[in-house]
Regions:
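Extracellular/periplasmic helix-exit of transmembrane alpha-helices
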Residues: 52-60, 64, 174-192, 203-206, ...
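Membrane-interface alpha-helices at helix entry/exit sites of multi-pass transporters
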Residues: 32-37, 83-90, 243-256
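Conserved small/polar residues in nucleotide/adenosyl-binding loops
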Residues: 319-326
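Membrane-interface "cap" regions at the ends of multi-pass membrane proteins
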Residues: 1-20, 65, 241-243
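Helix-loop junctions at the membrane interface of multi-pass solute transporters
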Residues: 14, 24-30, 56-62, 148, ...
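Flexible loop linkers connecting adjacent transmembrane helices
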Residues: 1-3, 25-35, 39, 47-81, ...
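Helix-loop-helix module between adjacent transmembrane segments
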Residues: 11-14, 41-66, 73, 77-109, ...
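Membrane-interface loop-to-helix entry segments
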Residues: 108-115, 132-182, 186-194, 321
Length: 329
C-alpha cells in the first residue's frame, strides 16, 4: 500500500471509540483536567510513535505473497536477536487477545449505542426493541467487515484511504460548529481544563479530589486513543511502499497529533461547552458526547453523530480484525 494508505489505515485504528467514548469517560471520572494530561501524554506519545513506526519499517520482512509485514514482533525478533524471539511471541499473543476487547467489543458497542440513540430520538424504536436491533446491527457489521478483510491488506488500505479523511473532516466540522455556537463558554472551559488538571475538586464539587486520578484518566485515555507505546499502529506503517523509515516515522507523529490534539480536544470541547450537566464520578460513554451535540444543534443531529461514530468505530474494526490473507500476529 502507499504511505498515505498506511497512515489512513493506522489512523483507522486510533481514530475510533477513544476519541468519543474514551474522552467522555475521562472527563466524567477525572474531571475536565483529564484533558490536560491527555495532551501531555500525546506530546510524549509522538516521540514513542515515531520510534515505533521507524523501527517497524526498518526491520520489516516480506511474506510469501511478496507484501511487506512488520510491527513490534518483527523488530523485536530482527532487532534484538534470536534470544529475544520469545518476547516477540508473547507480544503477538497478547496483542491478539487485546484486540478482542479494545479493538472489537468497544467499537461495536459504540456503533450500537449511537444507532440506538438516533432511532430512539426519532421514535423509530423503544427500549423493548433495542436488543433485537443490536443483534441485527451486529450481524450487518460482521458481514461488512468480512467483505473488506477477505480482500486482504490492499483492500483495507483502499477502504480506509477513503473513509478516514471523510469521517475526520465530517466530525471536525460538526464539533467546530458546537464550539463556535458556544464561543462565550470557551474561556471558562479552558480554565476548567488547566486548573482542574492540578486541582480537580475546584470544578467537580469535590467528587473528583485526586490529581493522581485525573492524571491517570487523562493519560490512560490518551494512550487508548492514539495507541502510542502499544505498538499496534506500526503494523500498518510497516506495509507502506517506502524505503525511508524516518519519513514514515514522521507520519506517526502526525497520527498522534491528529488523533489526540485535534479530534480528542474537539470532543472535549463539545462535552464541556455544549453538553448538559456532567455527573462527575459516574462512568459515561458515547452518550455524553452525543448530548453535547444534541444540546447545541437539537435532536436532528443524532443521525449525523450516529454516522460519524459508526464510521469511526467501523474503520477501527477493519484495522484490529486480522485479515485471513495478509495480516497475522
Amino acid at each position: 500500500m502507499t504511505p498515505f494508505q498506511a497512515v489512513c489505515t493506522a489512523l483507522a485504528s486510533t481514530v475510533g471509540t477513544g476519541n468519543i467514548a474514551g474522552v467522555a469517560g475521562a472527563i466524567a471520572i477525572g474531571g475536565a483536567g483529564a484533558v490536560f494530561w491527555m495532551w501531555v501524554s500525546a506530546l510524549l506519545g509522538m516521540c514513542t510513535k515515531f520510534s515505533e513506526v521507524t523501527l517497524a519499517v526498518h526491520y520489516r520482512e516480506k511474506n510469501a505473497e511478496g507484501d511487506y509485514v512488520g510491527g513490534p514482533m518483527y523488530y523485536i525478533k530482527n532487532g534484538l536477536g534470536k534470544k529475544w524471539y520469545w518476547m516477540a511471541s508473547v507480544y503477538a499473543i497478547l496483542g491478539s487477545l487485546t484486540v478482542l476487547g479494545t479493538g472489537n467489543a468497544t467499537q461495536v458497542n459504540t456503533i450500537t449505542t449511537s444507532i440506538d440513540s438516533a432511532l430512539i430520538s426519532y421514535n423509530v424504536i423503544d427500549d423493548a426493541q433495542i436488543s433485537m436491533v443490536n443483534l441485527v446491527i451486529g450481524i450487518v457489521i460482521a458481514a461488512l467487515v468480512a467483505v473488506v478483510l477477505l480482500g486482504g491488506v490492499k483492500r483495507i488500505g483502499t477502504v480506509t484511504e477513503k473513509l478516514v479523511p471523510f469521517m475526520a473532516v465530517f466530525y471536525i466540522i460538526l464539533a467546530i460548529g458546537v464550539v463556535v455556537l458556544n464561543a462565550d463558554k470557551v474561556p471558562h472551559v479552558f480554565e476548567m481544563i488547566f486548573v482542574g488538571a492540578f486541582n480537580p475538586s475546584a470544578f467537580t464539587g469535590g467528587v473528583v479530589g485526586s490529581m493522581f486520578m485525573t492524571m491517570r484518566r487523562g493519560v490512560s485515555r490518551g494512550i487508548f486513543s492514539n495507541e502510542a507505546g502499544i505498538g499496534t499502529g506500526s503494523i500498518a506503517h510497516a506495509c507502506a511502499d517506502t524505503d525511508e523509515p524516518v519519513k514514515q516515522g514522521m507520519f506517526g507523529i502526525f497520527e498522534v497529533f491528529a488523533d489526540t490534539i485535534v479530534i480528542c480536544t474537539l470532543t472535549a470541547l463539545v462535552i464541556l461547552c455544549g453538553g448538559e450537566g456532567i455527573q462527575y464520578g459516574v462512568a459515561a460513554g458515547a452518550e455524553l458526547t452525543i448530548s453535547g451535540f444534541v444540546t447545541t444543534y437539537g435532536s436532528w443531529v443524532t443521525i449525523f453523530t450516529a454516522i460519524a461514530m459508526c464510521c469511526f468505530a467501523f474503520s477501527c474494526l477493519l484495522y484490529t480484525s486480522p485479515s485471513p490473507r495478509d495480516r497475522s500476529l
